[in-house]
């Protein structure tokens, strides 16, 4: 680990938390927001459109990171993040609102790629693994706080959740004060891209990692798209109750991510990812078959474990198996697949039938992904 202050670490973790809230912070108050903005399209789009923005702009950001460096890219991401997120409730025109949410996704991917590049440059080996685990915890803890606060504020006034985006401004001040402005020279990475065999291995290992990234976030975000409408209808939840329920998933993910280094040391990284998808399958299976709220909370625990064992670990695999010159590009692709998964979750609303079919289909897909990844990793051990 390079010389880095505690304030720098705190800054990295706080800024990381912004990536989870880009769409989800308004989720608990989504019915009220859709009604007041007179949004004519599928309600879930307001949550997932930033994800589509990430997908569109990720290739550009992946190239910019090598030209601008993480510090400049991060600063240029935080400013529009605050502005575009905040002005959402002013935009009564549906098409302007759609453009705003798409551009918010561009700001988000700039933040994610820049902050992960900082981690790659400032930390090495076990320290890097630990920091990525902490980053996963920070992201999910942000989910806990922002969903809870978003639900609470949404009950007071439908516009209040949009004010949370302004947190990017004090975080920008912390970035200016604590993070290095110049690129940091790195020691030779595990994969340098100098050897053709290593290049081939990198390409081969990245394919399932990117696929796993897509499905892990798509599966996770099914809850964000379906639960805001399902819980009030089935269990008479208020907006704040919905926010607390959904934030519980993130809380479990935080606790799981905190143990990720210990778990991977015992089971191995690739097996741990497969197990994470099995937990997803069990969680959504319970969501689909039960009408009891306490069983729903068991599903919350299982789903949270699934997320905590997949997305942070897949992020680590991208950093670990990327050469220095290809890391920015691979992180851009990772962001693209993660947020493409978020956007894809929108389309579960078009599955025929009620929420039962959505949850069961999600559980089945989770199982298939776990099996596929296990077979691939076994063959390429």
In which residue ranges do the predicted regions lie?
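Juxtamembrane intracellular "pre-TM" segments in multi-pass secondary transporters
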Residues: 2, 180-209
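Central cavity-lining transmembrane alpha-helices of secondary-active solute carriers
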Residues: 48-62, 247-259
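Conserved MFS/SLC helix-loop-helix module at the cytosolic interface between two early adjacent transmembrane helices
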Residues: 56-93
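Helix-to-loop junctions at the C-terminal end of transmembrane segments
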Residues: 58-69, 256-268, 353
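Paired small-residue
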Residues: 95-103, 283, 294-302
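Cytoplasmic helix-loop-helix junction between adjacent transmembrane helices
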Residues: 100-139
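Helix-loop-helix hairpin linking two adjacent transmembrane segments in secondary transporters
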Residues: 134-177
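A late C-terminal transmembrane helix in Major Facilitator Superfamily
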Residues: 319-356, 362
């Amino acid at each position: 680990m390079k010389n880095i202050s505690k304030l720098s670490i705190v800054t990295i973790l706080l800024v990381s938390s912004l990536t989870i809230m880009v769409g989800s912070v308004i989720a608990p108050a989504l019915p009220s927001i859709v009604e007041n903005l007179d949004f004519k399209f599928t309600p879930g789009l307001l949550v997932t459109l930033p994800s589509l923005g990430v997908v569109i702009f990720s290739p550009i950001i992946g190239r910019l990171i090598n030209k601008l460096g993480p510090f400049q890219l991060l600063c240029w991401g935080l400013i529009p993040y605050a502005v575009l997120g905040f002005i959402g409730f002013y935009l009564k025109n549906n098409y302007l609102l759609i453009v705003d949410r798409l551009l918010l996704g561009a700001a988000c991917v700039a933040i994610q790629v820049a902050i992960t590049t900082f981690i790659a440059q400032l930390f090495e080996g076990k320290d890097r693994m630990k920091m990525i685990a902490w980053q996963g915890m920070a992201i999910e803890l942000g989910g806990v706080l922002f969903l809870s606060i978003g639900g609470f504020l949404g009950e007071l006034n439908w516009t209040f959740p949009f004010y949370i985006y302004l947190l990017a401004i004090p975080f920008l001040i912390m970035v200016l004060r604590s993070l290095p402005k110049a690129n940091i020279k790195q020691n030779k990475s595990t994969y340098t891209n100098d050897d053709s065999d290593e290049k081939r291995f990198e390409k081969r290992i990245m394919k399932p990692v990117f696929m796993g990234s897509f499905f892990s976030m798509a599966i996770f975000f099914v809850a964000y798209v379906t639960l805001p409408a399902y819980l009030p209808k089935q269990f008479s939840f208020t907006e704040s109750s919905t926010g607390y329920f959904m934030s519980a998933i993130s809380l479990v993910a935080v606790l799981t991510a905190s143990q990720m280094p210990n778990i991977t040391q015992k089971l191995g990284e690739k097996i741990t990812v497969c197990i994470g998808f099995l937990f997803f399958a069990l969680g959504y299976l319970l969501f689909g078959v039960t009408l009891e709220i306490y069983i729903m909370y068991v599903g919350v625990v299982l789903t949270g474990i699934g997320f905590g064992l997949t997305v942070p670990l897949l992020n680590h695999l991208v950093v670990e198996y990327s050469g220095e010159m290809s890391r920015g590009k691979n992180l851009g692709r990772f962001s693209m697949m993660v947020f493409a998964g978020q956007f894809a979750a929108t389309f579960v609303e078009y599955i025929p039938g009620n929420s039962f079919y959505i949850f069961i289909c999600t559980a089945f897909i989770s199982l298939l992904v776990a099996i596929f990844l296990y077979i691939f990793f076994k063959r390429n051990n």
